[in-house]
């Protein structure tokens, strides 16, 4: 129960942080999704730092790891988890699996959004 609570609180903080970055990026103007790009890159950098730190330091309580990675970074961006998983596949030499994971996730994600929008636009 404690782990679920710390993930819940962390996700709320990460989501609020994401909203703040998007608001700040919107002030730059333009139609390019700079906020999302900044969030995805920053989240991926943070995921690498935290994962590496946990591995080197060890002894970090599970609740803290969940709060920081699954909670805050999960609320901030799921792209950081996607990036970590793709990197770990490549690091293990599973290049075909990594390519399938990256290309499949992106292609299926875009197709899913497109199909859902088409249904709503047609029948919504």
UniProtKB/Swiss-Prot annotation:
What is the name of the protein in this document? Answer: Fluoride-specific ion channel FluC
Give the similarity note.
Belongs to the fluoride channel Fluc/FEX (TC 1.A.43) family.
Q: Which UniProt keywords apply?
A: Cell inner membrane, Cell membrane, Ion channel, Ion transport, Membrane, Metal-binding, Sodium, Transmembrane, Transmembrane helix, Transport
Q: What is its main location?
A: membrane
The alphabetized list of GO BP terms reads:
cellular detoxification of fluoride
Q: What does this protein do?
A: Fluoride-specific ion channel. Important for reducing fluoride concentration in the cell, thus reducing its toxicity.
Q: Which taxonomic lineage does the organism of this UniProt entry have? A: Bacteria, Pseudomonadati, Pseudomonadota, Alphaproteobacteria, Hyphomicrobiales
HAMAP family with a match to the protein in the record? FluC
Q: What membrane topology does the annotation report for this chain?
A: Multi-pass membrane protein
Species this protein is from: Methylobacterium nodulans (strain LMG 21967 / CNCM I-2342 / ORS 2060)
What the record says about activity regulation is: Na(+) is not transported, but it plays an essential structural role and its presence is essential for fluoride channel function.
Q: Which reaction does it catalyse?
A: fluoride(in) = fluoride(out)
Q: Which residues form a coiled coil?
A: none
Instruction: Give a Pfam family name.
Output: CRCB
NCBIfam families linked to this entry: crcB, PRK14198.1
């Amino acid at each position: 129960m404690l782990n679920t609570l710390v993930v819940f609180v962390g996700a709320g903080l990460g989501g609020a942080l994401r909203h703040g970055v998007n608001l700040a990026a919107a002030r730059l103007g333009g139609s390019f999704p700079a906020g999302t790009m900044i969030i995805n890159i920053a989240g991926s950098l943070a995921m690498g730092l935290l994962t590496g730190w946990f591995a080197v330091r060890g002894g970090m309580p599970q609740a803290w790891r969940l709060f920081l990675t699954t909670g805050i970074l999960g609320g901030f961006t799921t792209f950081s988890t996607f990036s970590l998983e793709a990197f770990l596949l490549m690091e293990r030499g599973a290049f075909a699996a990594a390519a399938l994971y990256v290309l499949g996730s992106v292609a299926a994600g875009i197709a899913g959004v497109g199909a859902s929008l088409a249904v709503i636009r047609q029948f919504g």
